[in-house]
């Protein structure tokens, strides 16, 4: 598999409040070539890769702005062959999301029924772009109630769910990723409540499997 890793050097010139004003406040630096590059260059380089890894934090407005710019550029290259998959939306909200994209419900109803995150404004431009261009938007995250079941009772209770419930989950049993990933998880969670509990790790793997 050909991979393309993107490392971003973000240089802030002042406080940024709106996405429209962000463009002048960041630079994209290619650590391999030691050169500044553009979003268009990233998209061009993706012709030689199968996967683009874009590291982000949920509350990083600049990161989400860049994701949106890459999404737009990908659309210019690939058209309706692309889709948007979002962790924010749980699989049991796919119908609600589809109804919003189709114009059947308004954004206020979407926010209420889909339990949007507090910083939805950072993701909103991508959703609106997808809506305007009739692109598929995927509710990718397994419902939190099932993740909670695993964190409390392990993976076995998932097998006892109804067929309808299982449709909202990745194929069972899902991969629990032994090896370095597991080791890194417990290293990171060390000292946290439940950090040494394998059931908590299995619940993380359910999230991963659902969004992969």
Model-found features: residue ranges?
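Sec-dependent N-terminal signal peptides
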Residues: 3-13
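N- or domain-start disorder-to-order transition segments that initiate the globular core
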Residues: 8, 17-49
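Acidic/histidine-rich, surface-exposed loop or edge segments in extracytoplasmic proteins
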Residues: 23-24, 47-57, 106-111
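Zymogen propeptides
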Residues: 34, 39-75
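Solvent-exposed loop/turn segments at secondary-structure junctions
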Residues: 57-61, 89-93, 143-147
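Short internal beta-strands
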Residues: 82-90
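A substrate-binding/cap region within the structured catalytic cores of diverse enzymes
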Residues: 95-212
């Amino acid at each position: 598999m050909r991979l393309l890793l993107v490392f971003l050097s973000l240089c802030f010139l002042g406080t940024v409040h709106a996405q429209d004003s962000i463009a002048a406040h960041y630079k994209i630096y290619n650590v391999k070539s030691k050169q500044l590059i553009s979003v268009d260059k990233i998209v061009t380089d993706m012709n030689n890769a199968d996967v683009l890894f874009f590291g982000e934090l949920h509350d990083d407005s600049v990161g989400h702005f860049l994701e949106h710019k890459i999404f737009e550029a990908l659309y210019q290259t690939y058209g309706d062959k692309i889709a948007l998959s979002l962790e924010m939306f749980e699989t049991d909200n796919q119908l609600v999301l589809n109804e919003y994209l189709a114009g059947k419900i308004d954004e206020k109803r979407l926010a209420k029924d889909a339990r949007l995150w507090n910083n939805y404004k950072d993701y909103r431009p991508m959703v609106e772009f997808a809506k305007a261009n009739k692109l598929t938007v995927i509710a990718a995250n397994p419902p939190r109630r099932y993740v909670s079941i695993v964190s409390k009772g392990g993976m076995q209770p998932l097998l006892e769910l109804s067929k309808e419930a299982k449709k909202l989950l990745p194929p069972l049993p899902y991969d629990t990723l032994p090896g370095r990933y597991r080791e890194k998880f417990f290293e990171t969670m060390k000292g946290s409540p439940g950090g040494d509990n394998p059931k908590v790790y299995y619940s993380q793997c359910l999230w991963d499997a659902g969004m992969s």
